């Protein structure tokens, strides 16, 4: 199974982060993604990294889960870093070949982008590992509630997002099963050039799509059997409650923002 995939999984627990209101965690995660772009020097990234490490320690979840969360996107991160490093001009030139050059600014910006990617993935992983899918769906629905004024389907969108998030690990597990079955029949996904590798993936996509549609149909049938008719007039078994600890967390992010502004100057 594809146990390497962490994003989308939930690990039950009773830590400080687990007990936070899902609305606070969702707001904090989006806020974090926004303020990380305020960092423009190494002192700022050290501050953000220390803040992230402290948040991870409060979750009581092993750091290896967060490191494994980076692996599926590692090649994309490295590709982005390489482009930034090779095509950014400015500062001392370390290497020059045609339009490709490695400069002081390019290396610095590349490392900054790497740090941004990793820290954002860490914080996003922290959100999904400590928040149950139903809680996340309720939080999204609550935060999007003002859009009901313009007839936006808030409940349906929040349900769709939570189901999509929940089924990411399931689809990856299904992909691994299909790949193992085809390897047993002699298919080698790592053999040949790029075109041959792409052709080898085609037989993988068809059963994966069939399996996905079957799962979607089973889910729809189960929801209809339980009387699901949308969010109109629907009551909730679990009511979200905002506590002092949630306010403290948001205040902590405000302090982080102030610290980043100070370090920028």
What spans do the regions from the language model cover?
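A diffuse structural propensity rather than consistent per-protein peaks
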Residues: 62, 102-103, 243
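Transmembrane alpha-helix interface motif
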Residues: 1-44, 48-59, 142-145, 149-152, ...
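Transmembrane helix-loop junctions in multipass membrane proteins, especially transporters and channels
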Residues: 41, 45, 60-64, 88-96, ...
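Small-residue-enriched core segments of transmembrane alpha-helices in multipass membrane transport
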Residues: 51-57, 70-78
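Alpha-helical transmembrane segments and their helix-start/interface "positive-inside/aromatic belt" motifs
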Residues: 25-26, 64-74, 246-249
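Juxtamembrane/interface alpha-helical elements of multi-pass membrane proteins
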Residues: 73-187
